[in-house]
Amino acid sequence: MAAAPWLYLSRRRSSTQTSLRRFLICSSSFDADEFISSQSRVIGGRGEEEVRFSGALFSRMIHSSTYHPYRQIPLPHSVQLLDASLGCRGFSSGSSNVSDGCDEEVESECDNDEETGVSCVESSTNPEEVERVCKVIDELFALDRNMEAVLDEMKLDLSHDLIVEVLERFRHARKPAFRFFCWAAERQGFAHDSRTYNSMMSILAKTRQFETMVSVLEEMGTKGLLTMETFTIAMKAFAAAKERKKAVGIFELMKKYKFKIGVETINCLLDSLGRAKLGKEAQVLFDKLKERFTPNMMTYTVLLNGWCRVRNLIEAARIWNDMIDHGLKPDIVAHNVMLEGLLRSMKKSDAIKLFHVMKSKGPCPNVRSYTIMIRDFCKQSSMETAIEYFDDMVDSGLQPDAAVYTCLITGFGTQKKLDTVYELLKEMQEKGHPPDGKTYNALIKLMANQKMPEHGTRIYNKMIQNEIEPSIHTFNMIMKSYFVARNYEMGRAVWDEMIKKGICPDDNSYTVLIRGLISEGKSREACRYLEEMLDKGMKTPLIDYNKFAADFHRGGQPEIFEELAQRAKFSGKFAAAEIFARWAQMTRRRCKQRFMED
């Protein structure tokens, strides 16, 4: 199938390779061969050239801009605005001015059964049963009534699938989730299995309830229900919280319960530390353990990634060369990690040189390699260069995927070239790579940034029509854009839609809603949602507490602050508790002063 006409306009050159070479071989403060050297080594019984990095040179690299003046890519014809093409009915709201129109042509082009975002549990559980249970938990937990007694009266046919689905619905609300989990454990004839335990472990890990998490892990150990996933959840949680010693301590628990600590387990921990920007700590751990196991390609790759994430290219180069010295040939994954590391460290010219070496000496760049480069060019608004790389990828026989197109869509959308965005979406369909969840989220973000929430809603509806499940991030973006535009009714309608779809609000969801309600002047309603957050054990939202408190202060209602202070203190939110307690005192003094004056 032929490419979209506008793409050909970017190919004004005798050869894609020739044009790219103009970008790849550019002037720099030092010679490319000095930066990246190749040495002949015998790998696997045959002589091959290996790329080596001169780590010392990283300390004196001078960033050389590779941007070239670019012109706007003309289109052969004008197109309608993107939102008109994706238009369909928005969220239900009495005052909504969202168009009910729908472009049938685009609808027919956007068939996509790929689901992203909220994870779905494959089970035979009746959705209505899940809904009933969640409704009871929602209504009775917040009111502090006997939730367990009502659940008992429901005479549920408990199954592991039901437990997992309910926990999934409350994955951001640890207190109701844990209370339901404990209630289920006490039901006669039911016992948790590894899957339900791991679901609860994930919730505790995400909310950093480490003491409870370890207790659950040990309980699993006594029942013989531990799996490698259990330990992985705990290791990743401690690493994400930068608790290196506790993460390493999971090894001791593995030994206690007779689990083998192999290279995969060590790689998992090193990777978790690296992703938490603890590259140095990952290296120290590796140096302590390297005599006890045989590192493989993945081991060096995760170490490389850890150093690249903290922008330490000298150590990254050392790991790279270490890998080669141990007889391992860096694969395409390692090369892509290094590409990202160079770009993250603002060494664009050096990333381009490495990319050129990959094309000439191997491993040949894959779609991920091109995506890394194109994404960076798009971030810098160097769209013509991004198109050059896109064309070269196609000419190399690689099929662009939704991720590459999403980068281009974001780049052109940021420049407000919505006609070009529309053409890209059209081409995605024609090439058999329809938009996925991330593409739709990128489009919604573009609309939100341009303060066009109604158009974001239309894109959301298109997403639903194409059977792509929205993520919590999708709803948060749309809800925030409506509140920013002071369309409070539609902002609340988005919240209602999210709850209706069974998506558990996270900390950001509550923060957006509470800020919107305060801005609307509905501090009492905002107070109700703040109490709900505290009751669920969620983080205290970052809001203007002084503005929030001033409304109640003027009304002379100190008991509201006292209640909030007590709830915050009980939930361990001591800073917020102090703020509420201070406002309670101020309000009481004011009330007393008024009484004396009267």
From Swiss-Prot:
Against InterPro entries, the record matches this protein to: Pentatricopeptide_rpt (IPR002885), PPR_P_subfamily (IPR050872), PROP1-like_PPR_dom (IPR033443), TPR-like_helical_dom_sf (IPR011990)
Cellular component GO terms, alphabetical:
mitochondrion
Is the keyword Oxidoreductase assigned to this protein?
A: no
Query: Transit peptide: is it a keyword of this entry?
Result: yes
Q: Where are the PPR repeats?
A: 193-227, 229-261, 262-292, 296-330, 331-365, 366-400, 401-435, 436-470, 471-505, 506-540
Here the transit peptide covers 1-98
Write out the coiled-coil annotation as residue ranges: none
Q: Where in the cell is it found?
A: Mitochondrion
Entry keywords, A to Z:
Mitochondrion, Repeat, Transit peptide
Source domain of life is Eukaryota
Tell me which PANTHER family the record gives: MITOCHONDRIAL GROUP I INTRON SPLICING FACTOR CCM1, PENTACOTRIPEPTIDE-REPEAT REGION OF PRORP DOMAIN-CONTAINING PROTEIN
Family per UniProt? Belongs to the PPR family. P subfamily.
Q: What is this protein called?
A: Pentatricopeptide repeat-containing protein At5g14820, mitochondrial
